[in-house]
């Protein structure tokens, strides 16, 4: 089974998207959008910029990159000690976040999977999900 985008709409009409792997693991999760059109637009943006470079200011991945221009992925260590990445759009706003991973290598594996699958994954919709 291949990766897919899921648009999840709540009963109030807000929605967000998730890019899920073939094993149904989250690869990217977008923020709340007020309309379905905005959510679809966010998926279109993620498809376009999925090959963006990785910014790692603190050198968690082995080599610090310094600050990069948008669009980009930003590698981060969460206050909980777990690692994640976020996808930033050309306008400088965060578009989506990756899963919280226990190790740097797990986060880099999730990033590689997101880059590989984001461009061509099909889209499905769910109503009433969380």
Label the model's feature ranges:
Residues 1-7, 11, 43, 47-81, ...:
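Intrinsic disorder/low-complexity detector
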Residues 38, 106:
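Residue-level recognition of oxygen-bearing side chains
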Residues 27-35, 55-61, 95-103, 123-129:
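Short, tandemly repeated low-complexity microdomains enriched for cysteine and small residues
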Residues 8, 14-22, 27-33, 42-45, ...:
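A structural feature that tracks compact, well-ordered secondary-structure segments
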């Amino acid at each position: 089974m291949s990766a897919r985008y899921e648009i999840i709409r709540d009963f109030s009409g807000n929605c967000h998207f998730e890019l899920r792997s073939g094993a149904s693991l989250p690869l990217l999760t977008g923020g709340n959008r007020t309309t379905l059109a905005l959510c679809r637009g966010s998926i279109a943006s993620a498809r376009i910029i999925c090959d963006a470079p990785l910014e790692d200011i603190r050198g968690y991945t082995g080599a610090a990159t310094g600050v990069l221009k948008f669009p980009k992925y930003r590698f981060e260590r969460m206050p909980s000690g777990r690692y994640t990445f976020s996808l930033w759009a050309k306008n400088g706003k965060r578009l989506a976040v990756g899963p919280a991973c226990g190790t740097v290598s797990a986060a880099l594996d999730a990033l590689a999977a997101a880059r590989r699958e984001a461009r061509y994954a099909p889209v499905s919709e769910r109503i009433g999900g969380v």
